[in-house]
């Protein structure tokens, strides 16, 4: 019985680490390239875009995974209306916790997409393509319009990925 106790501890710690990674959105395998979506608070537009991107990339068999981050997270949760809207589309984000964007997030990314925001001056690593989406309306006041705009952009982004990245 004594020898099985360390095994149980290892299993519990492993489970906690896997859960923490899933909640933070950091599930990029070595074979995947990371796309980083950034909005101001990190809990609405970037979360919606990352959700749409991950589903579409998976459906198309692309080696990409997206993360959601914020330049100035002001909450530890996702607004209930956004949770409900995304749940209606098959995304379970109730346990998601917004995270502030870091230089490491940007450095690990193949592409950075800024949604109605800008990166802080100290976070502009050279050589990483960035694009700005300025036409996404607030999801809190018009979820359907924000969803449509984000889906349109995500479709174009996936279509724009280099052919060598799609294999």
Q: How should these model regions be labeled?
A:
Residues 1-9:
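Bacterial N-terminal signal peptides that target proteins for export
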Residues 8-19:
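Bacterial N-terminal signal peptides
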Residues 22-24:
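Bacterial signal peptide processing site
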Residues 26-101:
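Conserved active-site segments centered on acidic
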Residues 106-107:
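A short, aliphatic-rich alpha-helical micro-motif
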Residues 110-112:
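Conserved acidic residues
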Residues 115-121:
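Short, polar loop motifs at secondary-structure junctions
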Residues 121-167:
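Phosphate-binding/catalytic loops
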């Amino acid at each position: 019985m004594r020898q099985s106790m360390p095994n149980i501890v290892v299993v519990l710690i492993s489970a906690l680490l896997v859960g923490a990674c899933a909640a933070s959105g950091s599930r990029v395998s070595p074979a995947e390239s990371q796309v980083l979506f950034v909005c101001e608070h990190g809990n609405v537009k970037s979360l919606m875009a990352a959700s749409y991107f991950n589903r579409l990339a998976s459906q198309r068999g692309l080696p990409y995974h997206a993360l959601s981050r914020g330049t100035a997270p002001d909450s530890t949760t996702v607004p209930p209306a956004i949770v409900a809207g995304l749940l209606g589309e098959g995304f379970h984000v109730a346990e998601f916790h917004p995270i502030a964007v870091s230089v490491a997030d940007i450095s690990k990314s193949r592409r950075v997409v800024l949604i109605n925001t800008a990166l802080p001056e100290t976070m502009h690593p050279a050589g990483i393509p960035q694009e700005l989406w300025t036409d996404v309306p607030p999801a809190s006041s018009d979820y359907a319009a924000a969803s449509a705009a984000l889906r349109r952009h995500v479709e174009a982004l996936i279509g724009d990925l280099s052919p060598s990245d799609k294999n």
